[in-house]
């Protein structure tokens, strides 16, 4: 399943696909969430995190943010099996790993156990990079773009959010 290429252009389709994966508990080893729609990236990140890790589980969760990442530490965490959990989750949020980590990072992703999942959140990515191509081939790329958010899509999304709260417009 991890070799399945799933790249969507519209946020709604991405959310549907992520919801399906969560229901089926069929996760990829690596997720790349990107685009100029930060709210949808944040929502997707939280959906995946909440599905894989229980709230407050600090043993099986580590976050690297704002350009601060050490590949040795990342590798150590990626190869550590989860403790009383099905998954170990590593979040790389705004680290620039797609620009800096290249070969060593690809090696980590290729060899880490199926019990480890990495979520990468970057506003912009170079689609020509080796890391991007590896993730596109072996993981999941969700691209959330403002230009794809039509009025119809946004209205349905708002209606769905309100429906969860038992409200209508």
Describe the function of each predicted region:
Residues 6, 10-169:
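Conserved beta/loop motifs at nucleotide-recognition and modification sites
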């Amino acid at each position: 399943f991890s070799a399945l290429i799933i790249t969507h252009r519209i946020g709604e389709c991405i959310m549907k696909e992520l919801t399906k994966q969560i229901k089926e508990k069929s996760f990829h080893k690596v997720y790349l969430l990107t685009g100029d729609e930060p709210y949808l990236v944040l929502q997707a990140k939280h959906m995946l995190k909440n599905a894989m890790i229980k709230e407050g589980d600090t043993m099986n969760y580590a976050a690297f943010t704002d350009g601060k990442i050490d590949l040795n530490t990342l590798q150590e965490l990626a190869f550590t099996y989860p403790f009383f959990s099905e998954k170990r989750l590593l979040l790389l949020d705004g680290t620039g790993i797609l620009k800096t980590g290249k070969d060593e990072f690809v090696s980590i992703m290729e060899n880490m156990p199926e019990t480890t999942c990495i979520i990468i959140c970057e506003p912009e990515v170079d689609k020509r990079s080796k890391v991007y191509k590896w993730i596109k081939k072996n993981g999941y790329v969700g691209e959330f773009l403002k230009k794809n958010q039509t009025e119809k899509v946004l209205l349905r999304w708002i209606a769905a959010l309100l429906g969860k709260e038992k409200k209508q417009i």
